[in-house]
């Protein structure tokens, strides 16, 4: 997949940033429950007056940033974060940890359901999809239950 990056845009890393209503709860969820590596955190004592955390997903070339923000909407069903896990066993381990912590599952698109994924809500109500394959590395699983 690395050789697919366009030479006309030679970016060295990508960061996705999202607002969160409760930075500490978000930090506990992504860092504690999902165990994403916390790369950096900053408090509101900066030029922008914004506090936040940055997680590596799965390394420093792709990062996920959350900042404390006034959320003006509850998002929509297309606002998803998908974590591609190496296999069904890894998915079960992470899903069990989320369920035991009281994280609720949510209705997911048929695409994910038919391919063995599980969908949860993050602290801000956004969809977190756990998929049991690595996109771009593994073949996408054949849909199950479609037309059975």
Language-model region placement:
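A short beta-turn/loop motif at secondary-structure boundaries
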Residues: 44-47, 72-73, 110-113
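Core segments of cupin and vicinal oxygen chelate
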Residues: 8, 17-61
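Conserved beta-strand in the GNAT
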Residues: 64-67, 129-131
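Flexible, active-site-proximal loop/turn residues at the rims of small-molecule/cofactor binding pockets
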Residues: 45, 87, 134
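Short beta-strand/turn micro-motifs at beta-sheet edges
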Residues: 2-5, 67-71
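A short, sequence-level motif marking secondary-structure junctions
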Residues: 68-73, 134-136
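Vicinal oxygen chelate
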Residues: 1-9, 12-22, 53-58, 72-148, ...
């Amino acid at each position: 997949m690395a050789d697919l990056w366009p030479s006309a845009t030679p970016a060295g890393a990508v960061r996705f940033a999202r607002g969160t209503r409760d930075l500490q709860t978000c930090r506990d969820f992504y860092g504690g429950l999902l165990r994403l590596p916390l790369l950096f955190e900053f408090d509101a004592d900066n030029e922008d007056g914004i506090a936040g955390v940055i997680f590596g997903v799965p390394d420093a070339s792709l990062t996920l940033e959350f900042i404390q923000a006034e959320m003006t909407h509850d998002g929509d069903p297309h606002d998803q974060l998908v974590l591609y896990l190496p296999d069904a066993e890894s998915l079960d381990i992470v899903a069990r940890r989320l369920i035991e912590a009281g994280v609720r599952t949510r209705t997911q698109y048929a695409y994910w359901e038919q391919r063995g994924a599980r969908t949860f809500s993050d602290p801000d109500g956004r969809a977190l999809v756990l998929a049991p394959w690595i996109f771009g590395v593994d073949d996408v699983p054949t849909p199950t239950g479609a037309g059975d």
